[in-house]
Regions:
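Terminal low-complexity segments of carbohydrate-biosynthetic enzymes
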Residues: 236-406
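Short, well-formed alpha-helical segments that are part of the catalytic scaffolds
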Residues: 2-5, 23-40
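Conserved donor-nucleotide/metal-binding helix-loop-beta segment in metal-dependent transferases, i.e.
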Residues: 115-136
Length: 406
């Protein structure tokens, strides 16, 4: 790990981390906002701002260190050409331990809507005994599609947590949580985009104290161009976690809504994004599907394979409903556990995710933000309603997949 610690800081009570790759255009802005929040709300504590970088060739680190702040700064980076947000955060966790900090948070380097209040809302609950605080945002209705169609409904339906932004990227945590994360086995995809769902799912498993903060509007760089690899790494990490922790799927569960422990004040303004064309997304799904499906078609039951063949291979027009999507996800997760072709299963899921995304855009294009959010909530409820579709398959499976149903 590369480190530049100009003030030779050896200990801190609070660490605010900024994982980054090529964010020279925004790092000064976000560093200044963090500094303002620390000055306003935590001036009596030793705080340090840490940029955990991927050795960005655009000189993100140099811009960070040159940004004027009252609080000291430390720059750390992966070595050579090593990439991945997860690698950044692992380095950050190690630095938090090294500094002996009890309270920490991380914010994505592309955030444009951060305010000093974010710092207060994230850090104060940790000082009151919480161990992990996740965000709640108001976002453009087409932003956060992996959250809306995979991680949120699957956590809701299978684990029973109403965790609205499990891969938001901005979160706070205690030193206990940091120790817990470091002790876990990290799957390969957690070194990249899988890190956020790794952190959230492990936080659920930990039994530590969890909460949420309402941050108001979220403005950031659109991630549509990164969805391909991002989906693969998020899905692989989450499926890996669920497959290795079957004790977390009880037969009967009560839904748990995380307490809202702070709210940022201010007018809600939704980010304007470039027009999203469902036809382009649908074409991606249609192009990817045949090869992925060919390798797995014999493993799918007729109630899944029949509609897929009709939509993708015959009509070439997609209408993947929320109800059908929940069963597709559960079916492919089941196959992920019992078949060796795990990469092919995740790639098939990706093509179907793009199909679900296109279908949802067609369904929502005349709806306002509030109406679209209701559809996301309804989809999560369908995942909960249909959880027995997965549990029934797992219950029939003998040996290592037998669930603890009591």
């Amino acid at each position: 790990m590369i480190e530049n610690n100009p003030d030779k800081i050896k200990e801190a009570e609070i660490v605010v981390g900024i994982p980054s790759l090529n964010e020279a255009d925004n790092i000064a802005f976000i560093t200044d906002k963090i500094d303002q929040g620390l000055i306003k709300y935590f001036s009596g504590q030793k705080a340090v701002i840490v940029n955990s970088d991927n050795n960005s060739p655009d000189n993100t680190g140099r811009v960070f260190l040159r940004t004027k702040t009252k609080n000291p700064k430390i720059y750390i980076s992966t070595s050579g050409g090593q990439r991945g947000k997860g690698n950044n955060l692992k380095n950050l966790f190690l630095k938090i331990k090294d500094l002996g900090a009890k309270t920490a948070m991380t914010v994505d380097a592309d955030i444009k809507s951060i305010s000093a209040q974010w710092i207060k809302c994230f850090l104060e609950p940790i000082s009151r005994g919480y161990d992990f605080i996740a965000p709640v945002y108001r976002r453009h209705k087409y932003d956060g599609s992996i959250t809306n169609h995979l991680t949120y409904p699957l956590i809701y339906g299978l684990l029973g947590y109403d965790f609205r932004q499990p891969i938001g990227g901005d979160m706070s945590f205690s030193s206990r949580m940091v120790d817990y994360w470091i002790e876990q086995k990290w799957p390969p995809a957690a070194s990249g985009y899988g890190i956020d769902i790794f952190m959230t799912s492990q936080a659920i498993k930990s039994g530590l104290k969890l909460g949420q903060v309402n941050l108001g509007s979220k403005f950031h760089k659109p991630s549509l161009l990164k969805l391909d690899n991002m989906f693969l790494e998020v899905a692989e990490t989450f499926f890996n976690f669920l497959a290795n922790h079957r004790n977390l799927w009880p037969k009967e569960i009560n839904l748990k809504k995380l307490p809202l422990v702070c709210r940022v004040n201010g007018k809600i303004i939704y980010q304007k994004l470039p027009p999203v064309e469902y036809k382009e997304i649908e074409e991606t799904a249609l192009a990817d599907f045949p090869d992925c499906y060919q390798n797995l078609k014999d493993e799918l039951p007729s109630e899944i394979s029949g509609p897929l063949r009709m939509m993708f291979l015959q009509k070439k027009s997609l209408k993947i409903t929320a109800d059908f999507w929940s069963k597709v996800v559960y079916q492919l997760f089941y196959l992920y556990q019992v078949k060796p072709e795990k990469d092919l299963i995740i790639k098939l899921l990706r093509s179907l995710y793009f199909g679900r995304m296109a279908s949802a855009i067609k369904e929502e294009h005349l709806k306002n933000r509030k109406e679209s959010e209701k559809l996301v909530q309804k989809q999560a409820q369908l995942f909960f309603k249909n959880r027995n579709y997965l549990l029934g398959m797992a219950k029939k499976t003998q040996g290592s997949l037998a669930l603890e149903m009591n």
